[in-house]
Amino acid sequence: MLRIFIPTSNGKISRRRYIFSFILINFIFAFLIIFFNDGEAGFLVIVSTIVLHYLVINMNCQRLRDSGFIYIKTYVFGTLAVYIISIITMIAEDFACSGNGSMIFLICYFSTFSMLMLAPTDSSKQ
């Protein structure tokens, strides 16, 4: 479980561990963000959000590698581009939760999770 914190060029994660880790990390960081937000610790909310997305991107890269995907940098840069576009759109919409920026981010976030949850394991490298 701890290897999801360390980016590697050859780390892989199985489907079952990916689903469990994704759900667990999202719940833990959701509670942390809510707790820090209620205590008005804005810096800790930002740090928790950055660590959450770092872990999710790292887990997704490991799951992509387990599925046989070899262009990991394409995924990372594409995800960062979606994050930046979402943030710019949210700023333009005055951070409205029902705006397009939030929807772009959520669609990307959960469609990636769904795709990787259903992705087969690469059988050619077993």
UniProtKB/Swiss-Prot annotation:
It is found in: Cell inner membrane. The keyword Cell inner membrane applies. Its main location: membrane. It is a multi-pass membrane protein. The keyword Cell inner membrane applies. Keywords: Cell inner membrane, Cell membrane, Membrane, Transmembrane, Transmembrane helix. Residues 1-18, 62-67, 122-126 are cytoplasmic. Residues 40, 89-100 are periplasmic. The chain crosses the membrane at residues 19-39, 41-61, 68-88, 101-121. One of its GO terms (cellular component) is plasma membrane. This is Inner membrane protein YigG. It comes from Escherichia coli (strain K12).
